[in-house]
Amino acid sequence: MSEDEEKVKLRRLEPAIQKFTKIVIPTDLERLRKHQINIEKYQRCRVWDKLHEEHINAGRTVQQLRSNIREMEKLCLKVRKDDLGLLKRMIDPVKEEASAATAEFLQLHLESVEELKKQFNDEETFLQPSLTRSMTVGGTFHSTEDEADPQSMTQIYALPEIPRDQNAAESWETLEADLIELSQLVTDFSLLVNSQQEKIDSIEDHVNTAAVNVEEGTKNLGKAAKYKLAALPVAGALIGGVVGGPIGLLAGFKVAGIAAALGGGVLGFTGGKLIQRRKQKMMEKLASSCPDLPSQTDKKCS
């Protein structure tokens, strides 16, 4: 049984897959978004204990999300190859939503670090404590020029750095690692489905090319078979005419037998056996009409 025969039609797995794409994973993503809002709020207010607790809860949501994506992946791997295109359209929206949510969560911290570094290098604003990768966005900064002109004032919300002696600093690093792993899982899952579809497309192209080659090859083999069949009586007649008599007849028939053996790949096993039987009958007749000619049986005995 081939690998594809062990798989099933998409319609059999569609209800289970849609449960993940429309209910389970969107629910996890909504919960993750709420954690992100709370994390930003607690860090801005410097409520470190609450922030630490929210990091832990968000990490649990990320782990649950990873688990659900893996379960959905197992279902998708059971879908037959000819349904992969439809499957891809079914899972792409939730996959993109998960990827965007993870990137947004991580980008929040990245933009904070980059902005504060820029402010530090320009020496135009108040410097926050030393930066680490475990930072998010919060307080408001104003440049001197912005304060002079309220119409052109821009606000950059940068969250304060989490003190290294707070548990929230360590819990954020753990959450950050979980988010990166989740992002990689979503990417790998997407690549898996896409690679399977590309493999199917490649196989179809090769099958179409092979079909054309087989058709052309069949035509050529047919022509070759006709030419060989037409040549057999001619070659047999020429040799038989030169030798003459019963021996000449045998020689001519032998040429036909050799040609048939060489052309067995074209004529097939059945055709070869048919010629062989005819040859045997002819030799038996010749042996009976020519007593001096040894038979095949006598040759074997000798």
From Swiss-Prot:
Superkingdom of origin: Eukaryota
Coiled coil stretches, renumbered: 53-123
PROSITE patterns for this protein: SYNTAXIN (PS00914), T_SNARE (PS50192)
GO biological process terms on file: autophagosome maturation; autophagosome membrane docking; autophagosome-lysosome fusion; endoplasmic reticulum to Golgi vesicle-mediated transport; endoplasmic reticulum-Golgi intermediate compartment organization; exocytosis; Golgi organization; intracellular protein transport
Motif (Endoplasmic reticulum retention signal): 299-302
N-acetylserine modified-residue sites: S2
UniProt membrane topology term: Multi-pass membrane protein
Cited InterPro entries: SNARE, STX17_SNARE, Syntaxin, Syntaxin/epimorphin_CS, T_SNARE_dom
TM regions (residue ranges): 229-249, 255-275
Molecular function terms, GO-annotated: protein phosphatase binding; SNAP receptor activity; SNARE binding
Keyword Metal-binding appears in the UniProt entry: no
Entry-annotated residues carrying Phosphotyrosine: Y157
Protein family according to the UniProt entry: Belongs to the syntaxin family.
Cross-referenced PANTHER family: SYNTAXIN (PTHR19957), SYNTAXIN-17 (PTHR19957:SF139)
Protein name listed in UniProt: Syntaxin-17
Organism listed in the record: Bos taurus
Species classification: Eukaryota, Metazoa, Chordata, Craniata, Vertebrata
Name of the gene: STX17
